Curated annotation (Swiss-Prot):
Name of this chain's protein: ATP synthase epsilon chain
Similarity field: Belongs to the ATPase epsilon chain family.
GO cellular component: plasma membrane; proton-transporting ATP synthase complex
Higher taxonomy: Bacteria, Bacillati, Bacillota, Clostridia, Thermoanaerobacterales
PANTHER family reported for this sequence: ATP SYNTHASE DELTA/EPSILON CHAIN, ATP SYNTHASE EPSILON CHAIN, CHLOROPLASTIC
Function, in words: Produces ATP from ADP in the presence of a proton gradient across the membrane.
CDD domains assigned to the protein according to its UniProt record, in alphabetical order: F1-ATPase_delta
Quaternary assembly: F-type ATPases have 2 components, CF(1) - the catalytic core - and CF(0) - the membrane proton channel. CF(1) has five subunits: alpha(3), beta(3), gamma(1), delta(1), epsilon(1). CF(0) has three main subunits: a, b and c.
GO MF, any single term: ATP binding
Underlying gene: atpC
Superkingdom of source: Bacteria
Endpoints of the signal sequence: none
Subcellular location: Cell membrane
Keywords per UniProt: ATP synthesis, Cell membrane, CF(1), Hydrogen ion transport, Ion transport, Membrane, Transport
Lipid bilayer topology: Peripheral membrane protein
Length: 138
């Protein structure tokens, strides 16, 4: 019996992933959720800084994912995300610079809106660095 379902991950810049998979684990705004074939229909927001884990042919692959929505249907899953990167695509120097900029903005203690934006930027930078560090030499 086939235990796969179709997954499509889209960003504004590219089709990040498309194919049949056995399972995914996605970081949503309420925590991580695992999806298998025949999951109940669901629409949920994606965390601003999280991971997408894809199981295909018994092997797991992990990616950085940021913001957007996931729609689970009977015929598959579609993820619309602001950004998605494989670990080898993450520019560590750029992520480190983004982390430092966000930390500086947090120290400046500006408006609440600027603080929230800086905090989100810091979370994204830290998650990108965490994922990259698992697969790249830092």
């Amino acid at each position: 019996m086939d235990k796969t379902f179709h997954l499509e991950v889209l960003t504004p810049y590219r089709k990040f992933y498309e194919g049949d998979v056995e399972e995914i684990i996605v970081t949503t705004t309420t925590g991580q959720i695992g999806i298998l074939k025949d999951h109940i229909p669901l629409t949920t927001p994606i965390a601003q800084a999280g991971t997408l884990q894809i199981k295909k042919d018994g092997q797991w692959k992990e990616a950085f994912i940021s913001g957007g929505f996931m729609e689970v249907r009977r015929d598959g899953v579609t993820i619309l995300s602001s950004a998605a990167e494989w670990p080898e695509e993450i520019d560590i120097a750029r992520a480190q610079a983004a982390k430092e900029r966000a930390e500086e903005k947090l120290r400046q203690k500006k408006s609440k809106q600027e603080y929230i934006a800086a905090e989100a930027a810091l979370k994204r930078a830290l998650m990108r660095l965490k994922i990259a560090s698992k697969y790249q030499e830092m």
